[in-house]
UniProtKB/Swiss-Prot annotation:
Disulfide bonds: none
One example GO MF annotation: UDP-glucose 4-epimerase activity
Organism: Cyamopsis tetragonoloba (Guar)
Broad EC category: isomerase
Cofactor entry: NAD(+)
UniProt KW keywords: Carbohydrate metabolism, Galactose metabolism, Isomerase, NAD
Protein name: UDP-glucose 4-epimerase GEPI48
Binding residues annotated for substrate, in chain numbering: 130
Family assignment from sequence similarity: Belongs to the NAD(P)-dependent epimerase/dehydratase family.
GO cellular component, one term: cytosol
Active site: 154 (proton acceptor)
Length: 350
């Protein structure tokens, strides 16, 4: 079990790098492929340092999944037990402006990956999907049985890939596929050595908050303070990235269950936290005041979204351990040690 070799696409990214570290510490061998479009090879070097005696079980190849020949070479030289597929563009706003870029990158890259996997007899897959596939849910908590819809091209790429996975399994039952729908990943490894380092303008709340805290931005813009929530701001299910990484290890182990076909699991905490509650927790963790600018709601933003985690707890034997105080503590630890992310200087900030 412990000497399994796993291909991790997008393994230099935020969630990918944290998952690769947990894989190595769990005794797995990891081969990372990443085109470094929205990530840094520094993350891979730091994962190796954190992995200590397991560092030799990690190798990295810079490649784009759409490059079939390069991917073929990797599969020809290594026998993979399974694949964790993170790679993809993930900025909701950018996907609305550049839909073809998202369909090309996310869908074609995935199809090439699946074809090469099939050609080499590797049919175990963990796919990183997203709670965006629930669209604007009419009620909460979101269960895995909720109707699926997507409000933007990014979400649609996730939804289409989920459908491709279900179709592949229906066509060939020897595939074993787990789709993980993440909610809102935040935090960083407790060492403060790896974390989220978005290129350009962040897409998510916490990188914005941390950039205000370290002086890279003057204030945090809060989109919508007239929702029917406790303080008027949107409510989301924030999950610590280390919990999320552990969820992937649990999913990999579940692929060995002979009863698994194509299964879906939510990965969240099952608790909703408002934007203002999250900001307050970060202020307490960092000792910094976060100035706020109130703005109107963004079109397509849901009011309240949080996960039902019962299925993952029951079938994966996985449950999130960390609360928002630990998430903010670790986010600040990373931000204060790496105010400009992996770039290390102001010119990496846009």
């Amino acid at each position: 079990m412990s000497s399994q070799t796993v291909l991790v696409t997008g393994g230099a990214g935020y969630i990918g790098s944290h998952t690769v570290l947990q894989l190595l510490l769990g005794g797995f061998k990891a081969v990372v492929v990443d085109n470094l479009d929205n990530s840094s090879e520094t993350a891979i070097h730091r994962v190796k340092e954190l992995a200590g005696k397991f560092a030799g079980n990690l190798s990295f190849h810079k490649l784009d999944l759409r490059d079939r020949d390069a991917l073929e070479k990797i599969f020809s030289s290594t026998k993979f037990d399974s694949v964790i597929h993170f790679a993809g563009l993930k900025a909701v706003g950018e996907s609305v402006q550049k839909p073809l870029l998202y369909y090309d990158n996310n869908l074609i890259g995935t199809i090439v990956l699946f074809e090469v996997m099939a050609a080499h007899g590797c049919k175990k897959l963990v796919f990183s999907s997203s709670a965006t596939v629930y669209g604007l849910p009419k009620e909460v908590p979101c269960t895995e049985e909720f109707p699926l819809s997507a409000a933007n091209p990014y979400g649609r790429t996730k939804l289409i890939i989920e459908e491709i996975c279900r179709d592949i399994y229906r066509a060939e039952q020897e595939w074993k596929i787990i789709l993980l729908r993440y909610f809102n990943p935040v935090g960083a490894h407790p060492s403060g050595y790896i974390g989220e380092d978005p290129r350009g303008i962040p897409n998510n709340l916490m990188p914005f908050v941390q950039q205000v805290a370290v002086g890279r931005r003057p204030a945090l813009t809060v989109f919508g303070n007239d929702y029917t929530t406790s303080d008027g701001t949107g409510v989301r299910d924030y999950i610590h990235v280390v919990d999320l990484a552990d969820g992937h290890i649990a999913a990999l182990r579940k692929l060995n269950d002979p009863k698994i076909g194509c299964e879906v699991y939510n990965l969240g905490t099952g608790k909703g936290t408002s934007v203002l509650e999250m900001v307050k927790a970060f202020e307490q963790a960092s000792g910094k005041k976060i100035p706020l600018v109130m703005a109107g709601r963004r079109p397509g933003d849901a009011e309240v979204v949080y996960a039902s985690t019962n299925k993952a707890e029951r079938e994966l034997n996985w449950k999130a351990k960390y609360g928002i105080d630990e998430m903010c503590r670790d986010q600040w630890n990373w931000a204060s040690k790496n105010p400009y992310g992996y770039g290390g200087s102001e010119d990496s900030s846009n």
